[in-house]
Amino acid sequence: MADSAGLDQPEPSPRPVLVVDFGAQYAQLIARRVREARVFSEVIPHTTSIEEITARDPLAIVLSGGPASVYTEGAPQLDPALFDLGLPVFGICYGFQAMAQVLGGTVARTKTSEYGRTELKVLGGDLHSGLPGVQPVWMSHGDAVTAAPDGFDVAASSSGAPVAAFENRDRRLAGVQYHPEVMHTPHGQQVLSRFLHDFAGLDADWTAANIAGVLVEQVRAQIGNGHAICGLSGGVDSAVAAALVQRAIGDRLTCIFVDHGLLRDGERGQVQRDFVAATGAKLVTVDAAETFLQALSGVTNPEGKRKIIGRQFIRAFEGAVRDLLGDSTFDSGIEFLVQGTLYPDVVESGGGSGTANIKSHHNVGGLPDNLRFKLVEPLRLLFKDEVRAVGRQLDLPEEIVARQPFPGPGLGIRIVGEVTAERLDTLRRADSIAREELTTAGLDYQIWQCPVVLLADVRSVGVQGDNRSYGHPIVLRPVSSEDAMTADWTWVPYEVLECISTRITNEVAEVNRVVLDITNKPPGTIEWE
């Protein structure tokens, strides 16, 4: 199982399009959109030097937006030497203004700021060729480019931006004042793709799936003849990370699965059956449900529950690791710890430069200092949807690859109130019904996540049969999202909701009311606790 059979032969790591982050909330989204155009991309901070950029051997540069004014003291600066590299460059919002200023254009504060949906008028050029002459875009600016640099054609304007887009085909330079990366700009992806493929001349030949072989070889080179462990949660990230490492080093990987008793119905069996069957990985299961329940007894504060669950998880994982280290079969010890860190975590921690310490958002990130491992993070350059693509390339079961996000503390934070064995059983049965009906209705790929919440400290009066009931409410929380930073509530057909409600109130005796949460994020978080 240590070979990479079935995968494409590994190729060199792809040259990236570098997204220079000027403090934009959308920098990661820009990188995602570039990858959706089938070109590999990475985010780097605006403090990255020209020498560092050159060393990365990029295919092109995208300058992100940002909250500052180019005239504000201390505002992020753009090194003019960037334009001496001969690389294609595309500026967005603040990056567009910084680009204009450095190249000799004029940036000024106009009388009209633009925030939100704005009408863009196309004046010519190639960026918007074939697109509507007047189209909606998403703007967020106070300053504006009032004169394009010499040699640039003005491609579009708006009421608050005399120069809302410019381009220079000969130098492969272009930019826009609006945000092409957001869904509120309907033709934005076409504009970005046109720059990448037509202006920059880049091939659309990158996908997450076709780098699975590369990732396997990178892991094999990093671990060599060593042994590794991986904390397996049953989620997509840890499962794909473990599968990659197992493909690279075979039975020198041991996965540890801590069953804290807060899982949904059937999840333990899924991990033990489907994951092991698909990968052949060695799996150690730790039964810790009773320990977790004892620690959570009497606790109702959400943050308190999270801390207790995290602390107990670390202790259970640590105990399993110590048992392994005491096993004589590990003569050389265990040197490596596999984690399912994803690219958003790398960027948010300041790791985009490749030099900063990377935070760990996974449960095993809190291991004591005296248990020192070298980190293996095979997914650290991928987004969630790309991780799923790699998982499919590795032939992981669809039940694992397409699994909806599930919080580390599990059902413990989907019970509003104290966590008890009885309440877990009630929630587990209600959750199982909801998931079953959503799957039957074919909604698994339309709903990003659907938390089912038990309001354990709330009761309401009802009538079940000829008797008065006094049961708990269950909350359904279907949402759609790309990265969990924002989320919209998702419409579910009424007949599906009716079926879920009827089954839960009929089959789960402790529940007599089912309600629907239709709150977006913000203001509401996806999870209730």
Curated annotation (Swiss-Prot):
Entry keyword annotation includes Ligase? yes
Record's GO cellular component, any one? cytosol
Which reactions is this enzyme annotated as catalysing?
A: XMP + L-glutamine + ATP + H2O = GMP + L-glutamate + AMP + diphosphate + 2 H(+)
Q: Which Gene3D superfamilies match?
A: 3.30.300.10, 3.40.50.880, HUPs
Q: What is a single molecular function from GO for this protein?
A: ATP binding
Q: Where is the active site?
A: C93, H179, E181
Enzyme class, top EC level, equals ligase
Q: Where does ATP bind?
A: S233, G234, G235, V236, D237, S238, A239
Q: Where is the Glutamine amidotransferase type-1 domain?
A: 16-205
- Source superkingdom: Bacteria
Q: Which SUPFAM superfamilies match?
A: Adenine nucleotide alpha hydrolases-like, Class I glutamine amidotransferase-like, GMP synthetase C-terminal dimerisation domain
Which Enzyme Commission number(s) are on file for it? 6.3.5.2
Residues forming the GMPS ATP-PPase domain are 206-403
Q: Which UniProt keywords apply?
A: ATP-binding, Glutamine amidotransferase, GMP biosynthesis, Ligase, Nucleotide-binding, Purine biosynthesis
Which pathway does this polypeptide act in? Purine metabolism; GMP biosynthesis; GMP from XMP (L-Gln route): step 1/1
Q: Which Pfam families match?
A: GATase, GMP_synt_C, NAD_synthase
HAMAP family assigned: GMP_synthase
How this chain assembles, per its entry, is: Homodimer.
User: NCBIfam families, alphabetically?
Assistant: guaA_Cterm, guaA_Nterm, PRK00074.1
So what does this one do?
Answer: Catalyzes the synthesis of GMP from XMP.
Which protein is depicted? GMP synthase [glutamine-hydrolyzing]
Say which species the protein is native to.
Mycobacterium leprae (strain TN)
